[in-house]
Amino acid sequence: MEGRPPPEGRPPPRPRTGRAPRGRRRAVFAAVLHWSHITHLFENDRHFSHLSTLEREMAFRTEMGLYYSYFKTIVEAPSFLNGVWMIMNDKLTEYPLVINTLKRFNLYPEVILASWYRIYTKIMDLIGIQTKICWTVTRGEGLSPIESCEGLGDPACFYVAVIFILNGLMMALFFIYGTYLSGSRLGGLVTVLCFFFNHGECTRVMWTPPLRESFSYPFLVLQMLLVTHILRATKLYRGSLIALCISNVFFMLPWQFAQFVLLTQIASLFAVYVVGYIDICKLRKIIYIHMISLALCFVLMFGNSMLLTSYYASSLVIIWGILAMKPHFLKINVSELSLWVIQGCFWLFGTVILKYLTSKIFGIADDAHIGNLLTSKFFSYKDFDTLLYTCAAEFDFMEKETPLRYTKTLLLPVVLVVFVAIVRKIISDMWGVLAKQQTHVRKHQFDHGELVYHALQLLAYTALGILIMRLKLFLTPHMCVMASLICSRQLFGWLFCKVHPGAIVFAILAAMSIQGSANLQTQWNIVGEFSNLPQEELIEWIKYSTKPDAVFAGAMPTMASVKLSALRPIVNHPHYEDAGLRARTKIVYSMYSRKAAEEVKRELIKLKVNYYILEESWCVRRSKPGCSMPEIWDVEDPANAGKTPLCNLLVKDSKPHFTTVFQNSVYKVLEVVKE
């Protein structure tokens, strides 16, 4: 039959253009659109292309500046390997300690980007292509002119550009994800448009590019897409499992918090298994992949024991044990529901107990503040570290306005409709099973476990987002993915038989676009130009008026800038996830307590501090009742409550224990008088 000519009078069949190429083009378009959007917002907000090198570094505030400083170290080192050695034997970040910052701060993104930058500049130099253009910018108002360079040859521009490209590609993944989950390209369109319409609730990469989530989150999207594929597939292929392992590693390596997200995923998958939507073989393979990726991260992070003592690691071990004990569970003569409860309790209490034991055995307390933070959300628990977190808006409960913003763009109503449809399916599936009294009656698995998994993951992200506002950055994008299921024939086939799905989807998108376009316009209207003259004066004074080995202490955000731009040793910094660093910061912040100046000076001398950068605003500012620094110290040090805060006294007169050596409208540098 092959090669047979078509019958007379009938034209030859037209070659069929597959849906895949069209889908790929749309995914690429979504990627380019998001890259352009976040690049435009970042430039509009900072006028980054016209800033000097120092201004660009100051624009990376708090922990952003800390992370970027290690990229700068490797880029400016005599060789790449020398730069890596320097960050692995760092003497500036927690003086006088020598620490492996690659192990402590999840700096693989900076290592990789620095290597790419060095390769890029060498190749461009070799073939004679100019990589940056520099010019002099006149600032006016009596300020000195500055040199500003633009192009990928500038380290800061290269660093930011790669981050934006990665997050542009993430939007292509969202289109593919929504398409695959819903079974319709319309689903991919819904996901992408929901993300854009709720952009300010979905990401902050355009305002804070160097944060760990900017590197890590795109790989979580890929990882969840792979999990969806594995749950849906009738046959597991080795390639899918290897891809899942790699995406796990790429998600965990840049971000310490990744383990908590993966904990919610493992818990959701375990629940999906318990109620019968995936078989034991599939879950066991997923657990093995997670264990392998965790072990790889442990090795690549130079034996970072915080990974092994995490709730995530404990949960993996407990679930593996439950799966191994399945024959014993089936021998228990109880109802199906009772068996679910038994396995759930075994997982919950087993995970908590194993986590406690491993932390005690390894002597790890680095993540103790996470438990205290969660405790403070439900009870009246307070301590110094917890208050530093909860007094910051991003660690407070979700704003009351957030659900309203979701509702205005119709994201919340659409997701609720999808969620209710999934719950109806679950109830329908479970009805017959729960009516039985014995556990051995069910011989088959339910269909569409990936839908149940996404519903459970939505609940987990909702809990995280409500408890800690910053974590809505997981919730909102997942809601956008869930919204794609409004196009799913598995859930709404009964409706699509009566009404064309395109008509329903485009009607919903048209309604969404009313508030969505207003949200986008609000973002586009943000126009600013970065300037921080007081900090610029401070950095310039430090660079030219202090010795290269002078040791500084002060507020965490300022210390990151001192290390990055002045290259001076510091004793504390914004990466607060280490128990030792939290203890150091408490000593440094005692300057804002009501303790005696002599006592504070004595502790600073023990840390070998030469200069303290005092900021009066830290003494008086108050984000909400009980959140000024003196009030936080009243919880930690009630014996001195009622006394005048030390910072207020030192603002007026720093003698005799300190000497004022520099002062401007924001900063006052105190030299510690040695005894």
Swiss-Prot record:
Q: Which pathway does it take part in?
A: Protein modification; protein glycosylation
What is this protein's tissue specificity according to the annotation?
Widely expressed.
Which Enzyme Commission number(s) are listed? 2.4.1.-
Q: Which CDD domains match?
A: Dpy19L1 (cd20178)
User: GO CC: one term?
Assistant: membrane
Catalytic activity line of the entry: L-tryptophyl-[protein] + a di-trans,poly-cis-dolichyl beta-D-mannosyl phosphate = C-alpha-D-mannosyl-L-tryptophyl-[protein] + a di-trans,poly-cis-dolichyl phosphate + H(+)
Which membrane topology term applies here?
Answer: Multi-pass membrane protein
Q: Where is this region: Disordered?
A: 1-22
Its BP terms in the Gene Ontology are: protein glycosylation
TM segment ranges: 66-88, 156-176, 186-208, 236-254, 260-279, 286-303, 309-325, 334-354, 414-434, 449-469, 491-511
Question: Which InterPro entries does the entry mention?
Answer: Dpy-19/Dpy-19-like, Dpy19L1
Localization, UniProt: Endoplasmic reticulum membrane
Q: Which Pfam families match?
A: Dpy19
Q: Which GO terms describe its molecular function?
A: mannosyltransferase activity
Keyword Transmembrane attributed = yes
Keywords, A to Z, come to: Endoplasmic reticulum, Glycosyltransferase, Membrane, Transferase, Transmembrane, Transmembrane helix
Q: Report the sequence similarity comment from the record.
A: Belongs to the dpy-19 family.
Q: What does this protein do?
A: C-mannosyltransferase that mediates the C-mannosylation tryptophan residues on target proteins. The reaction occurs on the luminal side of the endoplasmic reticulum and involves the transfer of a mannose unit from a dolichylphosphate mannose (Dol-P-Man) donor to an acceptor protein containing a WxxW consensus sequence. C-mannosylates the first two tryptophans in the WxxWxxWxxC motif in thrombospondin (TSP) type-1 of UNC5A. Regulates neurite extension during development.
Supply the name of the protein.
Answer: Protein C-mannosyl-transferase DPY19L1
Q: What is the native source organism of this protein?
A: Homo sapiens (Human)
What lineage does UniProt assign to this protein's organism?
Eukaryota, Metazoa, Chordata, Craniata, Vertebrata
